[in-house]
Swiss-Prot record:
Cellular location(s): Cytoplasm, Cytoskeleton, Microtubule organizing center, Centrosome; Chromosome, Centromere, Kinetochore; Nucleus; Cytoplasm, Cytoskeleton, Spindle pole
Ranges annotated as biased composition (Polar residues): 540-549, 583-597
Quaternary assembly: Interacts with KNTC1 and ZW10. These interactions appear weak and may be transient or indirect. Interacts with dynein intermediate chain and dynactin (DCTN1). Interacts with the catalytically active form of USP45.
One annotated Gene Ontology cellular component of this protein: centrosome
Keyword Coiled coil in record: yes
InterPro entries referenced in this protein's UniProt entry, alphabetically: SPDLY_chordates, Spindly/BICDR_Dynein_Adapter
Protein name according to UniProt: Protein Spindly
Record organism: Rattus norvegicus
Gene: Spdl1
Length: 597
């Protein structure tokens, strides 16, 4: 029992010792935990302070970066402005130098031509003087021979009087012959002088034409610069209006409801005034453009017959544009080919490097991956070849279509040229027919009934636009020509709107006007008595009818007067119908290149 008690007491002591040790260890752990917690708090505070410092530095650096970026933007804007100013000044200097050089060249050309003309005249005068000198020498020799013969005849006293009279007549005839020869030589000299003068005048005409073309180009450049200045002025006016609106911002005023309403009313009034000003300016510009368009129409009416090579010029421009487009595509494809070759070389280098690096590794694993990659590569190569074949087919189709469109365009332009030639020949034949009728047809033939003559139904809107344009073009000065591009576009629109009978319906179905949808009896015009056509031809030629047959229109029957009234009514209707004008840009677009596309 005592042994058990002692054992239990020993165990109790051991347990108490262990409990004391555990308590000591717990106290030590608590102390360490408090120390670690305090260290953690200190670290957290330090981290917060450092984070705040970093954030402040970050914001400061961001502000500095923003300021520097703004400064860079302002500097870049100033640099761009200076570049533009320098560029504009350089362009102005180049233009001035070009003009001065051109003026000097013109002056030198004029001097050279004058010197050439003077040299030709001097050579001609020298040649004429030589001819006169030779002629005078011949005359002198003839006179000396005559004097010698006369002296011999006087010496011979046995000569009869008849022989002397014949000799005197012979000398008189020779004198007349020499006088006629001198007159012929003088006339030849005058003819040569006139030919030389004509050649010099032709050279002057060519030079004046070149100067006129250069002046037209200068006028075009001036007009373009004026349009740019107008656009810039309008932009500046719009910016000024925005600046005034921002200066009168209602947000800077009071917050009351009435003040906001008043501010809005003032802003709307300002906008209304701006819109009125814009409306007035646009109205003036529209009136100016209308006047310009009328002048251009009058000038175009005089230039309609000189428009033979314009279709060829437009076709040449279109072909040049297509050539530039194809050259750009070729350059782009060559660049892509170079890129693909570079990529292929890099890929081969990478494959060689990877093969050398992986050769030292396990060969069994690499064979599987290489086979897999080889299969994928073969598959991709097949797909690439198929896509290349499809691409080549598409390119061939595109080339075929482009060639087809070019052939169609060539046929179209050839047909238009033949149409213009046939129209001009038709007009000439009609003019000749009317002149022959007025010259050789008696007046009694006019009173023959109309049923016995052959009639031909013609649309009366054939000559009305050219008639009105030619009649108005006689009173206008055609010395000033506007822009060439606007002239071409307006000319095309004028022909599309007024001369719809000239173009086939398959090419421009959206522009044809149904002028002949309702045929009437008044539209039948006889080919025998057609005073309206003669008047049209005289108005197109710009000359008033001066023949006595045209002044006696009051003696014609009433049918001719009724036809005149009908033609005047139809002319008014045609002039009212042909008021729609479409403005076409001078740039070559794919829609404008060929209407069949």
């Amino acid at each position: 029992m005592e042994a058990d008690i002692t054992n239990l007491r020993n165990k109790l002591k051991e347990c108490e010792d262990e409990r004391l040790k555990a308590a000591q260890y717990g106290l030590q752990l608590l102390e360490r935990q408090t120390e670690l917690q305090s260290q953690l708090d200190k670290c957290h505070e330090e981290m917060m302070t450092t984070a705040e410092n970093y954030n402040q530095e970050k914001y400061a650096l961001q502000r500095e970066v923003e300021l520097k970026s703004r400064m860079l933007e302002s500097l870049s804007c100033e640099c761009e402005a200076l570049r533009q100013q320098q560029k504009a000044q350089l362009e102005q200097l180049e233009m001035q130098l070009h003009r001065s050089h051109r003026q000097e060249v013109h002056g030198l050309r004029n001097k050279l031509e004058n010197l050439k003309v003077e040299l030709d005249e001097a050579r001609l005068s020298e040649k004429q003087l030589k001819q006169k000198l030779d002629h005078q020498g011949e005359l002198l020799s003839h006179k000396s021979e005559e004097l010698r013969l006369l002296s011999e005849q006087r010496a011979l006293s046995s000569v009869s009087s008849e022989l002397l009279s014949l000799q005197t007549e012979l000398t008189e005839a020779e004198g007349v012959k020499n006088a006629l020869r001198e007159e012929v030589n003088e006339l030849q000299c005058k003819q040569e002088q006139l030919e030389c003068l004509n050649a010099s005048l032709l050279h002057q005409v060519d030079r004046l034409k070149e100067e006129k073309e250069e002046r037209e180009k200068e006028a075009v450049s001036y007009y373009n610069a004026l349009e740019k200045a107008r656009v810039e002025n309008q932009d500046l006016q719009v910016q000024l209006g925005h600046a005034l609106q921002q200066a009168a911002d209602p947000n800077s005023k009071g917050n009351s409801l009435f003040a906001e309403v008043e501010d809005r009313r003032v802003a709307m009034e300002r906008r209304l005034n701006l819109m009125k000003d814009k409306y007035q300016s646009l109205k003036k510009q529209n009136a100016f453009t209308r006047d310009q368009m009328n002048k251009m129409k009058l000038q175009i009416s005089t230039l309609l017959r000189m428009r033979g090579s314009q279709t060829e010029f437009e076709q040449q421009e279109r072909l040049f544009a297509m050539l530039e487009q194809k050259n750009g595509e070729i350059k782009h494809l060559l660049g892509e080919i170079n890129k693909l070759e570079k990529f292929k070389n890099l890929y081969e280098n990478m494959e060689s490097k990877s093969s050398t690096s992986d050769s030292a590794c396990a060969l069994e694993d690499s064979t599987y991956y290489t086979d897999l990659l080889q299969l994928k590569l073969d598959k991709l190569n097949k797909e690439n070849e198929s896509t290349k074949g499809e691409l080549s087919i598409q390119r061939m189709k595109a080339l075929f279509e482009s060639q087809r469109t070019l052939d169609i365009e060539r046929k179209l332009f050839a047909n238009e040229r033949h149409l213009q030639l046939s129209e001009s020949e038709n007009l000439k034949l009609r003019a000749k027919l009317d002149e022959l009728k007025l010259k050789y047809e008696p007046e009694e033939r006019i009173e023959v009934p109309v049923l016995k003559r052959r009639r031909e139904v013609l649309p009366l809107n054939i000559n009305t636009p050219e008639e009105t344009a030619a009649a108005s073009a006689t009173g206008e000065d055609v010395s000033r020509l506007p822009l060439e591009r606007k002239e071409e576009s307006c000319l095309d629109n004028l022909k599309d709107n007024t001369v719809q009978w000239k173009q086939p319906a398959s090419l421009s179905p959206h522009k044809s006007l149904p002028l002949d949808t309702q045929p009437k009896k008044e539209k039948c015009v006889t080919l025998v008595a057609s005073p309206a056509s003669t008047e049209v031809l005289h108005e197109q030629s710009g000359n008033t009818p001066s023949s006595p047959r045209l002044t006696e229109e009051s003696r014609l029957p009433t049918k001719v007067k009724e036809r005149k009234e009908a033609t005047s009514k139809l002319e008014k209707g045609a002039s009212k119908k042909s008021h729609t004008i479409m403005y076409v840009s001078s740039k070559s677009t794919p829609e404008m290149q060929c209407p069949q596309q």
